[in-house]
Design a protein with these regions (language model features):
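Intrinsically disordered, low-complexity segments enriched in Gly and acidic/Ser/Thr residues
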Residues: 295-380
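Bacterial signal peptide processing site
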Residues: 29-32
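A short beta-strand motif characteristic of beta-propeller blades
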Residues: 80-89, 122-140, 173-183, 217-225, ...
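Repeated scaffold domains used in trafficking and secretory/extracellular systems
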Residues: 45-57, 89-102, 131-152, 181-196, ...
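Acidic, serine/threonine- and glycine-rich low-complexity intrinsically disordered segments
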Residues: 196, 202-324
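Short beta-strand elements that form the blades of beta-propeller/WD-repeat-like
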Residues: 56-69, 95-114, 145-166, 189-205, ...
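C-terminal motif of bacterial Sec signal peptides marking the signal peptidase cleavage site
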Residues: 24-27
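Blade-level signature of beta-propeller repeat domains, shared across WD40, Kelch, NHL, RCC1
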Residues: 380-414
Length: 414
């Protein structure tokens, strides 16, 4: 059944006006993509952007990967068709990450890989959007604390002690986990594929040096830069952002030459208020991260500037980038909007989280996912996902009822 959309005509949405739809239509893992096709581009014998086994679409094909930490049940919610697809259960899943196409359910036994069947390819001056079958791929041998990062060519899995294993991402696209290669050495934090290379931090957690490898794992000329007590990373159009004790380090490449630029906080920041868990919209150069309990850091990578926005008690935060509000899910269960430049509180929803005061933290905590026009919030206890129009005073655009408790959520199609 298709979800029903009802527009909110007031600044704050009464919950009685949210019309929800039970979306219990399920599929099976590896099934062919179903439902009405989105608008597709014209094709030819070998058209530009052609990908075998996929359909090219004219717009973003967003899907939500969902997991129930209690039962291990997993689902994929297609935000274009409104259908829910059932995927293989993942018992003991304690976390969920994504590279924009694949979801990685983290367990003590390894990381279970699900192909969300939606992704984009950014050529700089234009973008291609694709959709394909949703399917379970297999398991990567990694612990629940493993950091997984990908680009179009390679997936890097770094374990908790800094050992990194490399996988051919094209094998994942073909539905299997291919042979693995081990990257020499031990690294502080995740190894990040970027610019057809691998960006890493070599050394211990107190002070690590930027090291760049080629795809075969051989060191290449690296910028002379260090990062003290590294925690957190993100890939933007401007380069790789690495979280350091004094702010961030931006590692970028031009014509195969890598450079590093420091972006300091500009003030003394206590350890517990550092930016260590970055969130952002794919393709955006504006990052967010909690700044302690009652504030959020916003890093404008383009302007090389940090802004600290005071908020209520933070559960999760994100933003779509320049011109969009800072979105903060607070412990009152409501999503709040803030003007990044002024810090002014601009909007809020009614409480979205069932039993807001008891919302989980850490593994299974709610998140805020953001794409080009909407934000998504998962209500684990209420078995629901909310779609928010952040350009319309945080209007609740849709509400998806589910047959699982979606404590884990990540968006693909980006």
């Amino acid at each position: 059944m298709d979800p029903t959309v009802r527009r909110n005509t007031t600044r704050r949405l009464p919950t009685a006006l949210v019309l929800t739809t039970a979306l219990l239509a399920t599929g099976c893992s590896g099934r062919a993509d179903d439902g009405p096709e989105p608008a597709a581009t014209e094709s030819s014998a070998t058209p530009h952007g052609y990908v075998e086994g996929a359909r090219e679409a004219a717009e973003e094909q967003s899907r939500l990967l969902l997991g129930d930490p209690g039962t291990g049940a997993s689902r994929v919610l297609d935000l274009v068709t409104g259908k829910v697809h059932e995927t293989a259960p993942v018992t003991g899943a304690a976390g969920l990450s994504t590279d924009g196409r694949f979801g990685f359910f983290h367990t003590d036994r390894g990381a279970h890989v699900v192909d969300g069947g939606a992704w984009m390819v950014d050529h700089g001056d234009h973008v291609h959007y694709y959709r394909a079958a949703i399917r379970d791929v297999g398991d990567l041998p990694a612990g629940r604390d493993a950091e997984i990062r990908s680009d179009v060519g390679v997936t890097a899995v770094t374990d908790r002690v800094g050992r990194t294993t490399l996988y051919d991402r094209t094998a994942l696209e073909e539905g299997e986990v291919g042979p693995a290669r081990t990257l020499a050495g031990v690294h502080a934090g995740a190894v990040v594929p970027y610019g057809e290379h691998l960006v890493a931090l070599s050394g211990d957690d107190d002070s690590a040096e930027v090291t760049v490898y080629d795809r075969e794992g051989s060191p290449v000329a690296s910028p002379d830069a260090t990062c003290e007590r590294p925690r957190g990373d993100a890939v933007t159009r401007r380069g790789v952002v690495l979280g350091c004790a004094d702010g961030a380090l931006l590692v970028s490449a031009e014509d195969g030459v890598f450079t590093a630029e420091r972006i300091p906080y500009g003030q003394d920041v206590p350890e517990k208020e550092r930016a260590t868990a970055f969130r952002h919209r794919a393709g955006s150069d504006t990052l967010t991260a909690p700044a302690g309990r009652r504030a959020v850091w916003v890093l404008d990578v383009t302007d090389r500037a940090w802004t600290r926005v005071r908020t209520g008690p933070v559960l999760a935060a994100n933003t779509a980038g320049e011109g969009s509000p800072l979105l903060v899910l607070e412990t009152d269960g409501a999503l709040h909007g803030y003007d990044i430049a002024t810090g002014r509180h601009t909007a809020r929803t009614e409480p979205l989280l069932t039993g807001a005061g008891k919302a989980a933290t850490g593994a299974g905590a709610p998140v805020v996912e953001v794409d080009r026009s909407r934000a998504y919030v998962n209500d684990r206890t209420g078995r629901r996902v909310y779609e928010i129009d952040y350009n319309d005073d945080l209007r609740v655009a849709r509400s998806f009822g589910l047959d699982i408790a979606p404590g884990l959520m990540a968006e693909t199609g980006r």
